[in-house]
UniProtKB/Swiss-Prot annotation:
InterPro entries: MADS-box/MEF2_TF, MEF2-like_N, TF_Kbox, TF_MADSbox, TF_MADSbox_sf
Covalent S-S links between cysteines: none
Tissue specificity of this protein: Expressed in lodicules, stamens and carpels.
GO MF annotation, one: RNA polymerase II cis-regulatory region sequence-specific DNA binding
Gene that this sequence comes from: MADS7
Keywords: Developmental protein, Differentiation, DNA-binding, Flowering, Nucleus, Transcription, Transcription regulation
Location within or outside the cell: Nucleus
Gene Ontology cellular component terms for the protein in this record: nucleus
Residue intervals of the K-box domain: 90-180
Record-given protein name: MADS-box transcription factor 7
Segments forming domain MADS-box: 1-61
Role according to the record: Probable transcription factor. May be involved in the control of flowering time.
Amino acid sequence: MGRGRVELKRIENKINRQVTFAKRRNGLLKKAYELSVLCDAEVALIIFSNRGKLYEFCSTQSMTKTLEKYQKCSYAGPETAVQNRESEQLKASRNEYLKLKARVENLQRTQRNLLGEDLDSLGIKELESLEKQLDSSLKHVRTTRTKHLVDQLTELQRKEQMVSEANRCLRRKLEESNHVRGQQVWEQGCNLIGYERQPEVQQPLHGGNGFFHPLDAAGEPTLQIGYPAEHHEAMNSACMNTYMPPWLP
């Protein structure tokens, strides 16, 4: 069964009246909060109990501003409210413009002072403050420049190390290549010389009395040009025995 209809009249029982007030008050505050959140509405709720105790809820940070807004909308005509709102917006825009204009003028004056212009109107304290500001700016510029130089130097050193390492690797590969190539040339030369020596040892020319004779020197391949020493001695003795001068009879 559904809930029965409650007759709207004052509850005579004091306890029941207080309990009903607490329940309905909490429900009303909850509904006001839900309305402000779900519908993005500006809600203000004011409740006074029969004893004069205040209960309130405001969706904004200030209940006073909401009440002032309510008064302007309630006690002024629609045209007056629109005019007041436009006037307030124009006033706020003008104030913002004046603030920005003053700030721009101040910045321009400071820039001219930093460039050394319009210094006659400055006092001693202002000049000292300007000098400190320039010193601080100069120090910051020098620090930044030094940092950039150090970073560039570090990068150059890193690149130099990379190039040096690459050069060492190339030099090592070149030395290894030259060593391997020299070893191959040496082995080919040894094989070629050994191949040419074998026929001379096995088949000597002219029965061992030829013009070219191999010499054994600790296994090293050598080549002797001409007749051996004993062959020269035999030839000299033969010439001396057979040669006769023309004046002999």
